[in-house]
Amino acid sequence: MKALHFGAGNIGRGFIGKLLADAGIQLTFADVNQVVLDALNARHSYQVHVVGENEQVDTVSGVNAVSSIGDDVVDLIAHVDLITTAVGPVVLERIAPAIAKGLVKRKAQGVDAPLNIIACENMVRGTTQLKGHVMNALPEDAKAWVEEHVGFVDSAVDRIVPPSASATNDPLEVTVETFSEWIVDKTQFKGALPNIPGMELTDNLMAFVERKLFTLNTGHAITAYLGKLAGHQTIRDAILDESIRAVVKGAMEESGAVLIKRYGFDADKHAAYIQKILGRFENPYLKDDVERVGRQPLRKLSAGDRLIKPLLGTLEYGLPHVNLVKGIAAAMHFRSDEDPQAQELAALITEKGPQAALAQISGLDANSDVVAEAVNAYNATK
């Protein structure tokens, strides 16, 4: 089996690329970073530090790389069996024209073997969005062929891969946590379902997408925002602060009550999942900075994201949300010289006041009780 993976960054190398290569798949990375491309093509291997209670160093081997903006990547798309991405939500639109060109070439060469494309991004139904961009870039006469022969498979991914300075200045070395989860929608594949260790197949993807968003992402963000307010440097420092831990755990339990109601998750198993995530935040080997995790607060306070979406669920089912509200208030306090969204947030609150600013960012009704609760919590933490 041959695979092409867009994005040779930390997540590409430390998570998806590693799983594919470990499964014996012939893997080529596509990226724009020439230093990384040259290193991959010189060595065809790299090291992954898996850190947790049992630290280990795994070597990923047998890999190649091409530029994601050259002709080589188009040629590859005409022949591979699987395309994956870990480029970041914003970049999906940029790689779509190359994918479209490759699909046109595949059709012209009469390659009718099924091809599946899986975007492994921190977003809901990212592959469906990528499909929209690819379809827009395709000529009309190729669209029906693509619909017939190409599967666009949505997925949910979860592994913490913080930026970490390599002791050896190796551009390929990467550090990851032990935990990883890659869940894909088996109803969207063309042809036979792949058997890749570490890839889980489900016919109810949204349950797992929201479980991750409402638990890991919600908890991670609230830990970062409360941690920043309290002067902590890392996620570990923040979650070991008992007052922060109580709010984070409480928020994950509140969002969990929504998941249990909506999808029928088992309450005891979900409680264990929350404990596992708290343990991941405590990992002493992951130097995960609160500033990094908290960045882009406008996106994280938007209606479909990790803070407001679970809150809307509590309103839908008439469930408590006191800790989620504290997390939202802390997010409104996030300030960072490095992050344009943090500056935009601060300017908006200064200009309009917290009530109107939160309503504008989140889509919540400015006159609702829950916005009043958030503003009270915001004012109480000044």
Curated annotation (Swiss-Prot):
Entry keywords, A to Z: NAD, Oxidoreductase
Enzyme class: oxidoreductase
Record's protein name: Mannitol-1-phosphate 5-dehydrogenase
InterPro entries: 6-PGluconate_DH-like_C_sf, 6PGD_dom2, Mannitol_1_phos_5_DH, Mannitol_DH, Mannitol_DH_C, Mannitol_DH_CS, Mannitol_DH_N, NAD(P)-bd_dom_sf
GO MF annotation, one: mannitol-1-phosphate 5-dehydrogenase activity
Similarity comment: Belongs to the mannitol dehydrogenase family.
Catalytic activity: D-mannitol 1-phosphate + NAD(+) = beta-D-fructose 6-phosphate + NADH + H(+)
NCBIfam families: PRK02318.1-2, PRK02318.1-3, PRK02318.1-4, PRK02318.2-2, PRK02318.2-5
Lineage: superkingdom: Bacteria
GO CC annotations on file: cytosol
Gene3D superfamilies cross-referenced by the UniProt entry: N-(1-d-carboxylethyl)-l-norvaline Dehydrogenase, domain 2 (1.10.1040.10), NAD(P)-binding Rossmann-like Domain (3.40.50.720)
Record-level GO BP terms: mannitol catabolic process
EC number: 1.1.1.17
Residues the entry annotates as binding NAD(+): 3-14
